[in-house]
Amino acid sequence: MKTVVFDIETVGMEFSQLDQYSREYFLKFSEQEEIENVHDSLSFYPLTAAVVAIGMMDVQTGEGAVYFQDKGRGLGKTQYNSFHLHPCDELMILKNFWKQLRHYDAFVTFNGRMFDCPFIMIRSIVYGLRIERNLLPYRYSNQEHIDLADQLSFYGCLSRKFPLHLWCKTFGIPSPKEDGISGLEVQNLFRQEQYLRIARYCSQDVVATKLLYDRWLESLAQAS
């Protein structure tokens, strides 16, 4: 069964870009000290953020690609480890994602059901793209979408949710956070026009997810 791992990075719009009613909505239940958190949270929602990178890796071959925004800087295609890095705009990021996904029977994410998948689908609708495949199939089956956050927590049976970093540390897998970057820093990196750093970080997230998938496949898949 051909399988692909993918991960996305997102960046929210500036709070000042929202219209008055939208700003009021986000601030409605916020105390003064929480307002900065409200600004930062815009990256989490497909209505107020854009996809700035999607990384994909073929599980069988280990080859990968990252499609990432460079805001028209003309960086050109480059290579990072086993990943081909392709600069483009958000529309082409999404088009390339759907094009590549056609070649796979199953896909692997970490927390993709709660974040990556609905984000990709909504942003695709924004651009008028046809949703070629339901990225949110029946949750309690791992035949098509293997969301490792679901699988490793036994569908939420653990007392709390744990991030990819903690799962990697527990299983002895190199975490992309060890390079000093996390998803929370992507917004600032994008403002600083460090587009290649975002692309490389995205590829590292994909590699970590793939290695975590390998552990799940070896030890737990048959019991899931």
List where the protein language model places each region.
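Conserved RNase H-like, two-metal-ion catalytic cores of nucleic-acid enzymes
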Residues: 1-92, 99
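Metal-dependent phosphoesterase core characteristic of DEDDh/y 3'-5' exonuclease domains
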Residues: 2, 49-52, 57-62, 67-83, ...
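Extended, compositionally biased low-complexity polar/Lys-Gly-rich tracts
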Residues: 91-94, 126
